[in-house]
């Protein structure tokens, strides 16, 4: 079974992940968020019950 032979694909997978980890990921993480998260207090919704006319 050729899937079990790690020679052709294992090296490519390792090189791909190293490329992602060393080059692409720091560039992506250097961007600042345009909308930084802010701490907000949760609001409770005050709703009035609906009176159905047929009950």
Swiss-Prot record:
This is ATP synthase protein 8. InterPro entries: ATP8_metazoa, ATPase_protein_8. It is a single-pass membrane protein. GO terms for cellular component: mitochondrial membrane; proton-transporting ATP synthase complex. Keywords: ATP synthesis, CF(0), Hydrogen ion transport, Ion transport, Membrane, Mitochondrion, Transmembrane, Transmembrane helix, Transport. Disulfide bonds: none annotated. The keyword Phosphoprotein does not apply. The keyword Transmembrane helix applies. The gene is MT-ATP8. It comes from Vireo altiloquus.
């Amino acid at each position: 079974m050729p899937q079990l032979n790690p020679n052709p694909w294992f090296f490519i997978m390792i090189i791909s992940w190293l490329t992602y980890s060393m080059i692409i990921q720091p560039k992506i993480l250097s961007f600042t968020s345009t909308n930084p998260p802010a701490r907000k207090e949760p609001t409770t919704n005050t709703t009035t019950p609906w009176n159905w006319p047929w009950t």
